[in-house]
Amino acid sequence: DQSRGLGDVYKRQNLKRSKYKYMPFQKLKIRNKNEIVTLRTKFADPTKISGKKVKYNEWNQLIKDKDTIVIDVRNEFEVKIGSFEGAINPKTKSFTDFKSFVQKKLNKSKDKKIAMFCTGGIRCEKASSYMMMKGFKNVAQLDGGILKYLEKTPKKDSMWNGECFVFDGRVS
């Protein structure tokens, strides 16, 4: 198990474990970075503020609400292979582009209900923090991301369409 002992190093991190028939990574490298996902702004600090975490079993009800703006926070190439019904594709090439999408397309929606999701939840922590620090009032994020939703939600109840890209080349 490559992650053994990491809990001691990164106590505040919620390590996600998955079982696979093969080793998805040949080696493990740990580095401290200024930003785990790069947004390049001082207006995003999930340790101070972030969106309300919505559990997988409450997600469908939230995104079915016609007054909710549902945003896929992932990059365009990820969105193209799968997403939730009715989700907005911000058409970003990299996560840094998300700021521009918010300013150009959502700035007049600060009082609307926002529901966002990403692969495992990390980008949503940052994106929801950014939006709240920019004045959005009602921001929610899918707790554990798409991967947790797909793991826990029965197929018959799932509102997910397509595949979910994972950065080591797998799809879920």
What are the roles of these predicted feature ranges?
Residues K11-I69, R74-G82, D168-S172:
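Flexible, polar/low-complexity N-terminal or interdomain linker segments that lie immediately upstream
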Residues D1-Y10:
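Single conserved hydrophobic/aromatic residue that forms the stacking wall/gate
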Residues R123:
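Hydrophobic/small residue at the entry helix of a nucleotide-binding pocket
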Residues N57-K64, T68, E85-I114, K156:
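Helix-loop module immediately N-terminal to the HCX5R catalytic loop
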Residues T41-K42, K80-E85, K99-V102, K126-Y130:
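A short secondary-structure junction signal
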Residues F117:
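Short, surface-exposed ligand- or partner-binding patches at beta-edge/loop junctions that are enriched
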Residues S100-D111, K126-S172:
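Cysteine-dependent PTP/DSP-like catalytic domain, specifically the C-terminal lobe
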